[in-house]
Curated annotation (Swiss-Prot):
Belongs to the UPF0354 family. It comes from Halalkalibacterium halodurans (strain ATCC BAA-125 / DSM 18197 / FERM 7344 / JCM 9153 / C-125). InterPro entries: DUF1444 (IPR010838). It comes from the Bacteria. It holds the Pfam family DUF1444. This is UPF0354 protein BH3252.
Length: 265
């Protein structure tokens, strides 16, 4: 399949009278915009092509659903007050925009050299990222939002599926609630996993919908973790980072030293 074929399929599936579709040939990007609101979403077709080659029609179906729910979210009037239990943190790459398309500065905190923490209001099938103007309008502080988000995060379940490779145990958290990677901010979960492992604890958040814990007991474990993390990163609809982290003394350490580190005895 080629980019032009993906473009054709998307244009057919996303053709609505209330939307305008425009295509940037140079960048190979399809823009979907609401005619009334003048807001919309842009799809980069080259990365989508790579996913189609791996996942087939499923990749296109997922993208169509993502656009439909995202466009519907633009229509909803969102307020923070009264929806405090729907505020959650989301992990994004440091390359993620600091402002939304309206030019409002998003509320975010630095997390690691690879990641940032943004804050979202859950709308059910979609979400909206909070920005500083919203907080000012509703007379709320960033500290209040952070506390609400982390409190709500701790209320989420933590279903883990284990897989063992060459003596190393890998735990996958994949509940598909939109906040799997966000659970890396749950310090009690990290500490619990730290106590559970026999070797070195490593953590990876390759994309929004998965969090990986690894109990590394030999050098083979590092190689497997790197491969698995890269695979998930390439498949993710919202990729975050292909680099795992070591967890020691309550801190997530950079992974460029991962291959040089030995598991604890």
């Amino acid at each position: 399949m080629e980019v032009r074929e993906i473009r054709k399929q998307l244009e057919e599936k996303l053709n609505r009278p209330e939307w305008t579709l425009s295509y940037d040939h140079k960048e190979a990007k399809l823009r979907i915009e609401d005619k009334e609101l003048k807001k919309g979403m842009t799809i980069a077709l080259k990365p989508l092509l790579a996913k189609v080659e791996r996942l087939g029609d499923r990749a296109i179906s997922e993208m169509v659903h993502y656009v439909q729910t995202g466009m519907a979210a633009f229509k909803k009037q969102t307020t923070i007050k009264g929806n405090e239990k729907r505020i959650f943190p989301v992990i994004r790459a440091t390359s993620f925009p600091e402002e939304n398309r309206d030019g409002h500065r998003l509320l975010f905190d630095e997390h690691t050299a690879e990641t940032r923490v943004y804050y979202s209001l859950d709308l059910g099938d979609s979400y909206t990222l909070l920005h500083e103007q919203q907080l000012s309008r509703e007379e709320m502080s960033a500290k209040e939002i952070r506390e609400m988000a982390l409190f709500n995060l701790r209320s989420l379940s933590e279903p883990l599926k284990a897989d063992k490779v060459a003596g190393n145990t890998f735990y996958f958290l994949n509940s598909n609630d939109g906040y799997d990677a966000s659970r890396i901010l749950n310090e009690s979960l990290l500490e619990k996993m730290s106590q559970k492992v026999e070797g070195q604890l490593a953590v990876a958040a390759p994309h929004q919908d998965v969090l990986i814990f690894a109990d590394i007991v030999n050098e083979r474990g590092y190689d497997v973790l790197a491969q698995v993390t890269m695979q998930f990163y390439a498949q993710g609809r919202i990729p975050i980072t292909a680099l795992p982290f070591l967890y020691e003394n309550g801190e997530l350490e950079p992974t460029f030293i991962l291959a040089q580190r030995k598991p604890k005895e």
